[in-house]
């Protein structure tokens, strides 16, 4: 891996069992700490996504090969988590719509994973995509038959999933304009919208929109808000002044 200069290896069954248990216990701690639910991150080339991806997963045991095998790790994490937190605690799963490169997870495979997750009781699916901060340069590109959009990058993919499962579907990425969000809500089966960077830029954004000021948020989607000093917007002028005074 170029960033960390580390060489990956296939996890042993003991290591897999340890991670499954760790995910479940982390979710239980979240519940005990007062959180309303948890989201299992199975996208963006993190560990669970690597198990799902035929590009990264070259295993020859029960965790590799077929899609059924590649999704086994995720399903074990969900099942172990549900056992610890109970039926009344929401568990969401974030998935990659497509990895957008040859040999990676396809949208058809992701749709199959979504259907399986619904079958075992997931409370919601967050449909994202593997773009590693390049979304703005990929707007207008079509992959697996659908197009990355300027507002709500992956909502075309999310809309398809929403028509195939009954569990709520959430879209994430490139959501800065309330008019565009309302258009997506009114014209697709997507029920919820996830925002992060816009709220770092403007923490009271939702309140402003509710009060009638519908101007888009001052967020350049640059992802420079992830800094060594913490997560904060480096674009918003008011936030810069506040940070300088800290």
What are these regions (language model features)?
Residues 1-246:
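Flavin-dependent oxidoreductase catalytic cores
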């Amino acid at each position: 891996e170029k960033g960390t200069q580390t060489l990956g290896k296939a996890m042993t069954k003991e290591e897999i069992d340890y991670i499954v248990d760790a995910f479940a216990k982390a979710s239980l701690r979240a519940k005990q700490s007062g959180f309303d639910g948890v989201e299992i991150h199975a996208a963006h080339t993190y560990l669970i996504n690597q198990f799902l991806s035929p590009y990264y997963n070259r295993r020859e045991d029960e965790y590799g090969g077929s899609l059924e095998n590649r999704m086994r790790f995720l399903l074990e994490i969900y099942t172990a988590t549900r056992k610890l937190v109970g039926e009344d605690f929401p568990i969401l799963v974030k998935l990659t719509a497509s990895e957008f490169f040859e040999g990676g997870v396809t949208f058809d495979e992701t749709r199959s994973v979504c259907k399986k997750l619904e079958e075992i009781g997931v409370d919601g699916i967050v449909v994202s995509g593997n773009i590693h901060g390049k979304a703005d340069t990929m707007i207008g590109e079509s992959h697996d038959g659908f197009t990355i959009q300027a507002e709500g990058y992956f909502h075309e993919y999310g809309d398809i999933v929403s028509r195939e499962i009954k569990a709520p579907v959430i879209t994430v990425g490139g959501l800065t304009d309330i008019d565009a969000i309302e258009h997506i809500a009114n014209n697709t089966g997507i029920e919820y919208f996830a925002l992060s960077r816009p709220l770092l830029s403007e923490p009271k954004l939702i309140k402003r929109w509710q009060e009638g000021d519908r101007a888009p948020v001052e967020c350049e989607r640059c992802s420079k808000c992830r800094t060594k000093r913490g997560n904060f917007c480096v674009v918003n002028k008011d936030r810069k002044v506040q940070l300088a005074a800290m």
